[in-house]
Amino acid sequence: FLLQDYAEKNPELVKRMIDEGHIVGNHSVHHYSMPTLGQAECESEIKDFHKYMEDNYDYTMTVFRPPMGEFSEFSLGVTANCGYETELWSFAYADWAVNNQPDEGQALEKLVNAAHPGAIYLLHSVSKTNTDILGDFIDRVRAGGFEFG
């Protein structure tokens, strides 16, 4: 799930995600709390990034993750009316503070222990810890009989 700013600053990575067949999800233009916005603002946060991805990558996004996981019945309705399915997560941890990163060993154990069929992990790209443990995490989860889809 990307913000528009990230897609604008990392075109090679976004193209690689698409070329490798990954689902690229919409996380909005500005990372505003969707329930605090009116209908036009909600639609703009979703549709403007949607148009950017179509115009710049010829890619149509279909899943949306509301910033901070904050949503309301109203914002879910707006999201659906924009043609999106809302997708949240089953696991998240405090990995977003670049100057307060979790311990690698503890983080790896948390992630591996949270594995279950259908698990959806929320891992932030700004996390050095996540970057450093990702290979080991993938190997251990696969060794536990799980697959990534």
Model-derived features with residue positions:
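Structural recognition of the beta-strand scaffold that forms the well-ordered cores
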Residues: 1-2, 23-28, 62-66, 85-89, ...
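Active-site beta->alpha N-cap acidic-glycine motif
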Residues: 1-61, 147
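Solvent-exposed loop/turn segments at secondary-structure junctions
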Residues: 4-8, 23-24, 30-34, 59, ...
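C-terminal domain-boundary segment and adjacent tail
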Residues: 5-9, 129-149
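Aromatic/hydrophobic pocket-lining residues that form the small-molecule binding cavity
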Residues: 10, 42, 46, 104-107, ...
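Generic structural signal for hydrophobic
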Residues: 14-17, 79, 114, 141
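CE4/NodB-like, metal-dependent polysaccharide N-deacetylase domain
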Residues: 23, 39-72, 77-80, 107-123
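His/Asp/Glu-enriched short active-site or ligand-binding loop at hydrolase and phosphoryl-transfer sites
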Residues: 70, 75-114, 146-149
